[in-house]
Amino acid sequence: MTTSADPTKQITYADAGVDVDEGARAVDAIKAAVATTTRPEVIGGLGGFGSCFSAAALKDMEEPVLVSGTDGVGTKLAIAQLLNRHNTVGEDLVAMCVDDIVPMGAEPLFFLDYVAVGKLKAEAVAEIVGGIAEGCRKSGCALVGGEMAEHPGVMNPDDYDLAGFVVGVVDKPKILGPEKVSEGDVILGLPSSGIHSNGYSLVRKVAIEGKTVEELNQPLEELGGESLADAVLRPTTIYAGGLLAALRAGAPIKAMAHITGGGITENLNRALPAHLDAEVDRGGEAGPAWDIPPVISYVSNAANLSLDEQYRTFNMGVGMALIVDMDDVDDVAEVLSDQGFEPFVMGQIIPGTGKVVYNDAN
């Protein structure tokens, strides 16, 4: 015999799977980290319905232009969840956003995050937001607000997803981009720290699936003694702070390309006008003039990827590409070195149709 539920029994939000008290604990756990990212323009603190940021500093610009961006971390999060390591994916989130607006020459001003979880756990959220705060400190933007959403019945309890939103500013006469690029310009690359935050569906398929956590934490000779877990979760390099400092120091950079999903092939072309190509020197059998991170080679070999497919999937060791006048290469390289970067020449600009081509000569 079946019985119906007591129609007089109270069913709370907690009964439905949403823990308001845990949400309050999570907010308390992140306040200190968020406070470390503040800027003078921030008005008020956490807890308001909206976040206020003074525009007074923009008065010194000739024509201030706001630049916005949004992104996520993708399926790299599934590996973080598998390994129960949550302290670096927030840094990835910030990197993916701020380094998408710096190619216009924009300074990131403030950042907001969206954290969706199956079941809210204050400690895990604190780790995630701690990473976001670290990324904001590195890029110089303020973490002014965000949203934590608990999705019981929609997401598994241990699952979460992240989205980030950044707003920056650039003076209109100083906007960088394809219209400044000319034939004969040189392409400089800045090293990546590894896979960064793109290509992880392939990484998981060929290098992660079927392995235990213990196996993933074992040192591998192919990775120079590093474990696969450490290699694939290494945080994405944040270039914004150093590049903006270089621009303020007078580095005459014409255009930039953030090398993310689609690799060099599908990103460097975004810095080109329609009548020019970017010729990248892959160096033939000897390989390029820069270092390809071992983890990228490891995954590419596991997937039997052709060279062309590698260059349209992974960053291949280039996290950011810059286009500069041939006569300015040495000066720009020196300024970049002063900011801690190790720039290298990776190609040149030639007549074409707005695409990336490869020179594979030895």
What are these regions (language model features)?
Residues 30, 52, 97-98, 203-206, ...:
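Buried hydrophobic packing segments
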Residues 58, 72-73, 167-171, 193-195, ...:
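Short, glycine-/Ser/Thr-/acidic-enriched flexible segments
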Residues 27, 126-129, 200:
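Hydrophobic face of alpha-helices
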Residues 3-4, 8-15, 124-142, 155-162, ...:
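Glycine-/charge-enriched secondary-structure boundary and capping motifs
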Residues 70, 161, 174-228, 265:
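Short, acidic (Asp/Glu-rich) active-site segment that either coordinates a divalent metal cofactor
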Residues 19, 71, 184, 258, ...:
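Residue-level signature of catalytic and energy-coupling elements of molecular machines
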Residues 32-193, 279:
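Glycine-rich phosphate/pyrophosphate-binding loop regions near the starts of catalytic domains
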Residues 2-41:
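N-terminal amphipathic/basic leader segments beginning at the initiator methionine
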